[in-house]
Amino acid sequence: MCIRDRFARDLLSIVDGRLVWESLVERVSSISGPVWLTFDVDGLDGSLVPATGTPVPGGLSHWGSVELIENLFASGNCEVVGADVNEIVPGTEGSLTEFSAALIATKIVACHIANSESKIGE
């Protein structure tokens, strides 16, 4: 599988954003083999992560990110062997960035635990 860039404007476009989003979710669901999941918080909307190297207006929403993570783990085609959440630049903006990153990390861990438990039950 190759790596592709996705632009927020393509995902959020009123005209065809939903189709592009569904295509992205489908691609994530079809990933197979061992996967290292790297989540750069600067891909989130800048209002969620003001303390990052490159805050992006119009980036991914929290719930969009959760949907992608859940679909990756639920696909059954891949095994997430590790993960990291990065691009956090602690500053004086408060703790919103760290909190947003912690929510994403918690979702990754929860999905990993749920996958591990479902494999034990098989």
Report residues per predicted region:
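Conserved small/polar residues in nucleotide/adenosyl-binding loops
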Residues: 1-5
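Catalytic cores of soluble, metal-dependent hydrolases
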Residues: 6-122
